[in-house]
């Protein structure tokens, strides 16, 4: 059967179009400042994690990435277990790439860039937006090393496991 399309309102939603235009104008005006803030927070987060957690690896290019994107893999842990511990602390994160969010399988994107299955399975994706603060990044950097070590201490394959 043929479906006829009808406008919701006469006039074509002018108010919505004007609102979208204003939102785009504001976004462009704030884009450079927002990008600088996100990049600084992202870089602090990445460097803090890599410096404080042995056997951690940045996934993707160190600078040619979205300003708020931090994707890191940790050897000898399961990403899903880390997500549960982070969630209990109020830290929102995901494992793998955005393409596989919600899946227990390792990210096909991480596998395609050459990560072994067990490393891709230990990945963590943290996304920073304009509402995040330096204090929140500091909180993650304070808590994450202990959580990763806790999971490694339970891992039967972790070579540094405490006897």
Question: Residues of each region from the PLM?
Answer:
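Generic structural signal for well-ordered, non-membrane alpha-helical segments
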Residues: 13-17, 31-42, 79, 102, ...
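Conserved core segment of the aminotransferase class I/II
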Residues: 1-35
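PLP-dependent enzyme catalytic core of the Aspartate aminotransferase-like
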Residues: 101, 105-163
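Conserved PLP-dependent catalytic core of the aminotransferase class-I/II
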Residues: 29-82
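Predominant activation on well-ordered alpha-helical scaffold segments within soluble catalytic domains
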Residues: 15-25, 46, 50, 83, ...
